[in-house]
């Protein structure tokens, strides 16, 4: 599939990506290579391959649940843009 500069510009606009004019030819080349790989994958015969959710059929070992009390309020509040009395302040969304 060939990607001309207009297609790249339009795709970048739809994806809300700021793409400088100087980068458009390189991005077009990258998109063509990606689509080439997609075409190679489409050409692979998979009718005899069973459908699977994951290629490895392994169980996930889980640790037992343990109740642990950790007071991390100060650590969590430090990353909040606005907090008051130990609570997050959020913008009012309903008038």
UniProtKB/Swiss-Prot annotation:
Its EC number is 6.3.5.-. It catalyses: L-glutamyl-tRNA(Gln) + L-glutamine + ATP + H2O = L-glutaminyl-tRNA(Gln) + L-glutamate + ADP + phosphate + H(+); L-aspartyl-tRNA(Asn) + L-glutamine + ATP + H2O = L-asparaginyl-tRNA(Asn) + L-glutamate + ADP + phosphate + 2 H(+). GO terms for molecular function: asparaginyl-tRNA synthase (glutamine-hydrolyzing) activity; ATP binding; glutaminyl-tRNA synthase (glutamine-hydrolyzing) activity. Transmembrane segments: none annotated. Gene3D superfamilies: Glu-tRNAGln amidotransferase C subunit, N-terminal domain. GO terms for biological process: glutaminyl-tRNAGln biosynthesis via transamidation; regulation of translational fidelity; translation. The keyword Nucleotide-binding applies. The keyword Glycosyltransferase does not apply. Pfam families: GatC (PF02686). SUPFAM superfamilies: Glu-tRNAGln amidotransferase C subunit. Belongs to the GatC family. Heterotrimer of A, B and C subunits. Allows the formation of correctly charged Asn-tRNA(Asn) or Gln-tRNA(Gln) through the transamidation of misacylated Asp-tRNA(Asn) or Glu-tRNA(Gln) in organisms which lack either or both of asparaginyl-tRNA or glutaminyl-tRNA synthetases. The reaction takes place in the presence of glutamine and ATP through an activated phospho-Asp-tRNA(Asn) or phospho-Glu-tRNA(Gln). PANTHER family: GLUTAMYL-TRNA(GLN) AMIDOTRANSFERASE SUBUNIT C, MITOCHONDRIAL (PTHR15004:SF0). This is Aspartyl/glutamyl-tRNA(Asn/Gln) amidotransferase subunit C. It comes from Acidithiobacillus ferrooxidans (strain ATCC 23270 / DSM 14882 / CIP 104768 / NCIMB 8455) (Ferrobacillus ferrooxidans (strain ATCC 23270)).
